């Protein structure tokens, strides 16, 4: 009776899958280990079954005027066997910027659908017509946007993929916080869940982005909070208990569909499955890991989630999406996290940062600003590195890097130098310049 009825669940241990295998005479150990989050053991070797790549793929962007109609359309769209069915609610569209992504002002929700085919484009176009017929029954903000080639499909996915890191731009103090981020309800009730969540957070005066895999009834809920502020902290705790409680009692859902329990949701595993089944989980854990050395405190724990909060980390501006790494010329050469924009951000903002310990990586940045250009959160890693370089223990280097960090002044000096370059290149001025600069450059070069 405690078996989750939703389409996917990663809460607790999958004893139901294990039992199903035993009923067929198969001890399906992967069913138990997959989703156990490293708490039961380590898989040292695995055989994977590969599936062929689809011959064709289409992506469709659909804007609905009414949120409730999205939920009504889902069962019909699922008959087309979509490989992806993503939803973004009105709040989310507002937060990421409608105009930046061409989203109509009157869209209550946007649906992103993707279909794969092993039979080629003809099959895809036929199913695209079926999709248009299904969506034509509802109030849409214009026609469906359908793309077949990769470049156009990537453009349609752009808003969805940039969604989470873009939320970091919203407020310098309030950041997207994940603590009720993975609930699952029956797919037919996803619109009802979204409406409930919008009403709840509106009452709390908390901005929130709600998006997720609507075909599975899986919602990713991301409130924007400053957990170092007492009022926001209290709102987070209240939302944690009220939303998880409502998902279990009102929606007959699961507290996590794919992200796992971890430490954040561990205290709710007992509430979801009941005492008898929870004690069975405990027995499984104790049997396979009697010394409790495999990820202790994960899944099986009574510790409140607030005990595990890294307050400093949650106040940082980086979303760790690694888009910056894709354009970083240093990372392109070294292919190492400590030689990348994302890695540098973690290094220079660490509590135990030391210039001498980090000198090699801090001075590797070319300050090309590519990271700032592509970052959805607007983080300028190169600027942070310039500030750290100005802390160089060598006085000469510190002065030079401090000057470089003051971009308007530094750029003015470079402009003046460029204009007088032809004069300094003459033999006599050049010799004087080299004689004056040599002691300074030697002192800097020793660092």
Where do the protein language model's features map onto the residues?
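Flexible, glycine-rich loop/tail regions that form catalytic "lids" or insertion modules at the edges
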Residues: 332-345, 349
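Non-catalytic, well-ordered alpha-helical scaffold segments
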Residues: 71, 107-110, 342-346, 359, ...
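Active-site-adjacent beta-strand anchor residues
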Residues: 63, 338, 374
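Cys/His-rich metal-chelating microdomains
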Residues: 321-327, 331-334, 368-374, 378
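A short, ordered amphipathic alpha-helix with a cationic face
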Residues: 121, 255, 334, 357-362
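Iron-sulfur-cluster electron-transfer modules
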Residues: 171-174, 350-447
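Noncatalytic alpha-helical scaffold of FAD-dependent oxidoreductases
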Residues: 1-257, 261-303, 307-322, 327-331
């Amino acid at each position: 009776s405690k078996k989750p009825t939703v389409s996917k669940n990663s809460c607790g241990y999958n004893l139901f899958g294990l039992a199903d295998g035993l009923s067929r005479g198969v001890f399906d150990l992967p069913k138990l280990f997959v989703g156990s989050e490293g708490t039961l053991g380590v898989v040292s070797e695995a055989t994977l079954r590969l599936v062929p790549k689809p011959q064709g793929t289409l992506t469709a962007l659909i804007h609905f005027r009414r949120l409730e109609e999205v939920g009504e359309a889902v069962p019909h769209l699922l008959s087309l066997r979509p490989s992806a069915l993503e939803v973004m609610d009105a709040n989310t569209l507002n937060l990421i910027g409608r105009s930046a992504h061409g989203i109509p002002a009157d869209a209550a929700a946007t649906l992103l659908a993707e279909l794969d085919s092993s039979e080629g484009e003809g099959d895809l176009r036929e199913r695209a017509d079926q999709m248009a017929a299904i969506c034509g029954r509802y109030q849409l903000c214009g026609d469906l946007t359908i793309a077949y080639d990769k470049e156009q499909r990537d453009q349609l996915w752009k808003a969805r993929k940039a969604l989470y890191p873009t939320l970091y731009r919203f407020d310098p103090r309030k950041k997207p916080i994940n603590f009720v981020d993975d609930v699952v309800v029956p797919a037919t009730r996803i619109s009802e869940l979204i409406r409930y969540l919008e009403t709840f957070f509106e009452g709390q005066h908390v901005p929130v982005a709600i998006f997720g895999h609507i075909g599975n009834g899986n919602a990713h809920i991301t409130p924007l909070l400053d957990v170092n502020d007492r009022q926001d902290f209290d709102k987070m705790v209240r939302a944690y208990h009220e939303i998880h409680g409502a998902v279990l009692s009102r929606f007959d859902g699961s507290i996590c569909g794919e992200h796992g329990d971890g430490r954040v949701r561990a205290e709710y595993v007992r509430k979801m499955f009941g005492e008898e089944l929870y004690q069975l989980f405990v027995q499984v854990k104790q049997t396979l890991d009697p010394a409790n050395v495999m990820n202790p405190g994960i899944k099986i724990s009574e510790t409140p989630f607030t005990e595990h909060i890294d307050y400093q980390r949650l106040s940082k501006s980086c979303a760790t999406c690694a888009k910056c790494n894709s354009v970083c010329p240093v990372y392109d050469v070294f292919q190492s996290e400590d030689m990348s924009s994302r890695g540098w951000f973690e290094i220079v903002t660490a509590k135990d940062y030391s210039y001498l310990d980090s000198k090699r990586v801090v001075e590797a940045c070319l300050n090309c600003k590519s990271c700032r250009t592509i970052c959805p959160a607007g983080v300028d890693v190169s600027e942070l590195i310039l500030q750290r370089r100005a802390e160089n223990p060598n006085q000469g280097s510190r002065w030079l890097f401090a000057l470089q960090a003051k971009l308007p002044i530094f750029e003015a000096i470079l402009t003046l130098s460029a204009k007088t370059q032809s004069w300094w290149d003459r033999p006599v001025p050049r010799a004087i310049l080299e004689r004056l600069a040599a002691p300074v450059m030697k002192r800097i070069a020793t660092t």
